[in-house]
């Protein structure tokens, strides 16, 4: 017998949960179908950064700020701790400082330039050696990615009656009917597929024709740092400036990109830039790298670890690197 809903959502990560929330708050009946007992994909493996500073001015930044508002609402609901931590982009090279100063002068997002002393007051994890300045933005938030998805799913079930069906693998979609591997059937007027890379299993031909490529990120986690090395603010390095679209309008970025391509082309090859987020328990998430398409393997590359650590040590200072 089919279970009938207004909306069926495949995937219990942040994207699926967001669609479930928006549908449920409009009064629609919603079923959330997740193939594992709890979300285990990108939603739980990342920094826990809510990062409006990375989005370019216009529609995308407006969407990011709207997302920020919803995360704050989750915090007010007591679902999880949502910290208004902000972010600091560090400059250890002259070309990095030039980009930050140009970005500050653009009529885009409100930011504040910090002296090295001001940076270290807010961010003891910043490496003072060669530090030229920092750029502070107050729009970024921090959540714990390990617990966020599970907490939100529980809240959606309790507050809105969202039917969260875990350990439910959808193997086929035919029209508005979804078939689970265990024989259960679901029917919905609208179906939203948010299963991450699992979309290849449901729509392999569409993925092939779309030209989309998978992206594998790699990051590391350091153990809890001592009390004197605790901070709330997110950190990003000069390498990050070439990664996010918000900085692409800075004419000074070209010199930075050229210098990196000449000095350290291996960083471009693996899409490496450097960021840090410290969780409330003192652990530090560090990263990250980006591999695309056919370059992706199920194995971690020691070379990537070594390159990331090399760059991380230039801009961050941890009391314990274990």
Model-flagged regions — what are they?
Residues 222-230, 253-322:
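Flavin-binding catalytic cores
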Residues 5-31:
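N-terminal Rossmann-like FAD-binding beta1-loop-alpha1 element of flavoenzymes
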Residues 62-63, 90-98, 135-154, 299-304:
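Short beta-strand to alpha-helix junction loop
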Residues 47-122:
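Dinucleotide-binding Rossmann-like beta1-alpha1 core, especially the glycine-rich loop
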Residues 173, 184-277:
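Flavin-dependent oxidoreductases
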Residues 25-44:
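Glycine-rich FAD pyrophosphate-binding loop
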Residues 12, 54, 92, 195-196:
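Glycine-rich, N-terminal phosphate-binding loop of Rossmann-like dinucleotide-binding domains
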Residues 136-176, 186-190:
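Helical element adjacent to the flavin cofactor pocket in flavoenzyme catalytic cores
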């Amino acid at each position: 017998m089919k279970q009938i809903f207004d909306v069926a959502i495949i995937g219990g990560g942040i994207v699926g949960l967001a669609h479930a929330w928006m549908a449920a708050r409009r009064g629609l009946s919603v079923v959330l179908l997740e193939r594992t007992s709890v979300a285990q994909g990108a939603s739980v493996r990342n920094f826990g950064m809510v990062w409006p500073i990375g989005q370019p001015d216009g529609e995308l930044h407006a969407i990011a700020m709207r997302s920020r508002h919803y995360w704050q609402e989750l915090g007010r609901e007591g679902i999880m701790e949502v910290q208004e931590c902000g972010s600091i982009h560090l400059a250890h090279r002259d070309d990095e400082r030039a980009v930050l100063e140009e970005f500050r002068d653009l009529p885009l997002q409100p930011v504040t330039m910090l002296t090295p002393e001001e940076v270290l007051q807010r961010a003891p994890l910043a490496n003072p050696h060669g530090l030229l300045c920092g750029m502070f933005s107050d729009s970024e938030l921090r959540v714990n990615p390990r617990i966020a998805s599970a907490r939100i799913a529980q809240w959606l079930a309790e507050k809105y009656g969202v039917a969260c069906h875990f350990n439910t693998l959808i193997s086929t979609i035919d029209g508005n009917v979804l078939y689970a591997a265990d024989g259960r059937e679901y029917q919905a007027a609208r179906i939203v597929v948010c299963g991450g890379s699992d979309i290849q299993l449901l729509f392999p031909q569409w993925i092939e024709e779309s030209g989309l490529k998978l992206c594998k990120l790699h990051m590391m986690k350091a153990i809890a740092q001592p009390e004197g090395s605790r901070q709330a603010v997110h950190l990003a390095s000069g390498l990050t400036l070439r990664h996010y679209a918000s900085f692409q309008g800075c004419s000074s970025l070209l010199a930075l990109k050229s210098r990196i391509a000449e000095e350290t082309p291996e960083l471009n090859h693996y899409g490496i830039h450097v960021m840090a987020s410290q969780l409330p328990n003192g652990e530090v998430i560090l990263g990250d790298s980006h591999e695309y398409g056919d370059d992706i393997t199920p194995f971690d590359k020691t070379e990537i670890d070594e390159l990331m650590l090399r760059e991380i040590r230039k801009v961050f200072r941890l009391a314990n690197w274990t």
